[in-house]
Design a protein with these regions (language model features):
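A short acidic, Gly/Pro-enriched loop at the edge of an enzyme's catalytic core
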Residues: 100-109
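Conserved S-adenosyl-L-methionine
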Residues: 51
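A short glycine-rich, Lys/Arg-flanked "PGG" loop and its adjoining helix->strand segment in the class I
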Residues: 126-138
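Conserved class I S-adenosyl-L-methionine
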Residues: 1-45
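Conserved beta-strand signature within the Rossmann-like core of class I S-adenosyl-L-methionine
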Residues: 139-146
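Class I SAM-dependent methyltransferase SAM/SAH-binding core
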Residues: 55-101
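A short SAM/SAH-binding and catalytic strip from SAM-dependent methyltransferases
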Residues: 108-124
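SAM-dependent methyltransferase
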Residues: 146-221
Length: 244
C-alpha cells in the first residue's frame, strides 16, 4: 500500500481485522439507503466504489441488483472483502488500486464513502476528481461524503474525543481518540491510542496520528463544480458527468 501524505487510520493496514468493528455502525444502513435513493433517481445500473474498504457499500448494492466493482488501495481490507464475497457467494470483482489513478471502465456511478476523499491532499483530490470523470459514462454521477469545515466548531471538535471498548471473537480493543483542527489549512488531525488483547495474550499498544483535509461547501462548488448537500457536520456531494 502506498504511503499517504496525511497519514491513515491503523485499521487500513496494521489493524485491518478491526476495521468493521470501528467503522461500521448504526449510521451505515442510513448512508447506504441515501446512496441507493440517489442511484434510483439517476437510473443507475453499474457502480464503481473507488474506496470500498471491506465492502460495506458494494455488498449492500449488489444484493439490491446493482452491478458493482469494488476498488481500494489497501490490500489488507480487500482481502477481507474477497473472503466475505467467497463465503456469501456474492459475485463482486475487487481491484487493488488508487482512486487518484485507477482506470477500470465506464460506469453509471462512482462512489467513495466514509470520508475517503478527506485522506487526500488538495492536489490529490483534484487528481481524483479528474480520474473519476474518466471512469464515468456521459451523464454519470459521483457520490461522496466529507466533513463540513464550516460546521467544525471548537465544541464539535472537542466532542470528537472519545473512549471506547469493544469485545468480539475473543479480542478486546480499547481505543482513546482526540482531535485538533487547523482552520488555516482545513485539516482535522486525529490522535489514536489502542490497547488490543487477543484472547489471553499480552495486550499490545499502538499509537497513531492521521489528518483529514476538509472543505466548506462553497469550496467544493466553486473549485470542482460539485453539487452539494450540507447535513450538519457532513457534506454529501455528487458530480454530474455532463458538467465537468
Amino acid at each position: 500500500m502506498k504511503k499517504n501524505t496525511l497519514g491513515l487510520p491503523l485499521e487500513y493496514e496494521k489493524l485491518s481485522e478491526y476495521f468493521d468493528a470501528r467503522n461500521i455502525g448504526d449510521d451505515t444502513d442510513a448512508k447506504n439507503s441515501v446512496i441507493e435513493r440517489l442511484l434510483k433517481t439517476y437510473k443507475v445500473q453499474t457502480v464503481l466504489d473507488l474506496t470500498c474498504g471491506t465492502g460495506s457499500q458494494v455488498f449492500f448494492l449488489t444484493k439490491r441488483g446493482y452491478k458493482c466493482v469494488g476498488a481500494d488501495f489497501s490490500p489488507a481490507l480487500l482481502e477481507i472483502a474477497r473472503k466475505r464475497a467467497h463465503e456469501e457467494k456474492v459475485a463482486i470483482k475487487f481491484i487493488d488500486g488508487d482512486m487518484r489513478t485507477l482506470r477500470v471502465g465506464r460506469f453509471d456511478a462512482v462512489i467513495s464513502i466514509f470520508n475517503a476523499v478527506g485522506h487526500l491532499t488538495k492536489v490529490g483530490f483534484e487528481k481524483t476528481m479528474k480520474n473519476v470523470h474518466q471512469n464515468l459514462k456521459a451523464g454519470g454521477i459521483y457520490i461522496f461524503d466529507i466533513l463540513n469545515l464550516e460546521a467544525m466548531t471548537d465544541a464539535v471538535v472537542a466532542d470528537l474525543a472519545y473512549c471506547t471498548h469493544k469485545k468480539f471473537n475473543g479480542t478486546q480493543m480499547h481505543l482513546v481518540q482526540f482531535s485538533t483542527i487547523n482552520r488555516n489549512n482545513g485539516r482535522l488531525t486525529s490522535y489514536d491510542n489502542y490497547i488490543v488483547q487477543k484472547n489471553a495474550a499480552k495486550p499490545e499498544k499502538f499509537g497513531n496520528k492521521f489528518s483529514l483535509q476538509i472543505y466548506t461547501a462553497k469550496e467544493l462548488v466553486t473549485t470542482q463544480k460539485i453539487e452539494v448537500t450540507t447535513l450538519g457536520q457532513a457534506i454529501s456531494g455528487y458530480l454530474n458527468g455532463n458538467v465537468w
